Design a protein with these regions (language model features):
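N-terminal, polar/charged subdomain of small-to-medium soluble alpha/beta proteins
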Residues: 21-24, 63, 145
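Short strand-connecting beta-turns/loops that link adjacent beta-strands
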Residues: 12, 41, 70-71, 98-101
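Intrinsic-disorder/low-complexity, polar/charged segments enriched in Ser/Thr/Lys/Arg/Asp/Glu/Gln
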Residues: 2-6, 43-45, 58-60, 73, ...
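Hydrophobic ligand-binding cavity/cleft-lining segments
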Residues: 1-47, 51, 156-157
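Beta-strand/loop substructures that line and gate deep hydrophobic ligand-binding cavities in soluble
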Residues: 75-129
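Hydrophobic/aromatic beta-strand elements that line small-molecule binding cavities or substrate pockets
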Residues: 5-7, 34, 60-67, 78, ...
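A conserved amphipathic terminal alpha-helix motif
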Residues: 115-156
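Glycine-rich portal/gate segments that line the openings of hydrophobic small-molecule binding cavities
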Residues: 37-82, 136
Length: 157
């Protein structure tokens, strides 16, 4: 299953990169995330509650950020299991300044596999569900960026 697209986030490239790789921001913005604990630099243990087409469960696994080239890109690897199934995926995140540099274009390209009960749902339902989760994540991250900018502006006054 492939997921790709791009989104524009509020903030300069370095600030967006820092937020997208901040464990607390990731924990807050991953839908259903109950745990996102760093176990080694760039590697996190996760617990998420999720569901697609009536199949609900708890996902436990790891998320690894690698190949970091701040502030341009990094690779995100996800591996985990849930209710007799598994999820594996790799995604590339690329960032580029947009316009006057006050916004950043984030491009993502990922490929994932699911097995077990969730695989029976099929691509027809998985693709839109994945896109919805990605959109929720980036809306939340844009909110994080705006909050951080507001806090920074208040601290500077």
């Amino acid at each position: 299953m492939k997921v790709d697209g791009n989104v524009t986030l509020s903030g300069p490239q370095q600030a967006v990169y820092d937020t997208l790789s901040d464990p607390e921001a990731l924990r807050q913005c991953l839908p259903g995330c109950e745990k996102f604990d760093e176990v080694s630099p760039g590697r996190y243990e996760t617990v998420l509650k999720a569901g697609v087409a009536g199949i609900k469960g708890t996902f436990t696994g790891t998320v690894t950020l690698s190949d970091a080239k701040s502030p341009e890109s990094y690779t995100l690897t996800v591996e985990g299991s849930f209710s007799g199934g598994f999820v594996k995926g790799v995604g590339n995140i690329s960032l580029a300044p947009e316009g006057d540099g006050s916004k950043t274009k984030v491009s993502y390209l990922g490929d994932g596999q699911v097995g077990g009960p969730l695989a029976s749902v099929g691509q027809r339902l998985m693709a839109p569900a994945s896109k919805m989760v990605v959109n929720q994540f980036f809306r939340c991250m844009d909110g994080q960026m705006k909050s951080r900018q507001s806090a920074g502006a208040q601290a500077g006054s």
